[in-house]
Amino acid sequence: MALAISRGFETALTKRELLNQGFSMKPELIPGDFDFQNSIPLWTPDKAKQAIFREFAFADFKQAFRFMTLCAQYAEELDHHPDWSNSWNKVTVHLTTHSSKGLTALDIQMAKAMDTFAIEAMR
């Protein structure tokens, strides 16, 4: 099953579908020379934590909650969940792939989706 085609994101298979096709549950790490600035310019790489980080700021709690709801629904589809916290209008996010002990394409895909959901939540 392709995910989030209607939102224009890259397609991905769920972990269950990958297992059914004989693939490992452990996604491959992205290369060390990955161009974060070009791919996800609003995110900050944290090499020490093998993660990427971003703080989102919204007009109010309602927008922040809408953003988190959109992200949570997509995270469930992708079976890839952020480490995040919320304080009124701010949402702080760290993305990493724990099973791979570092950054994978799942993190980049989730970051791009979150950037889009932030814009959608502010409408």
Language-model regions: role of each:
Residues 2-123:
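Charge-rich alpha-helical segments
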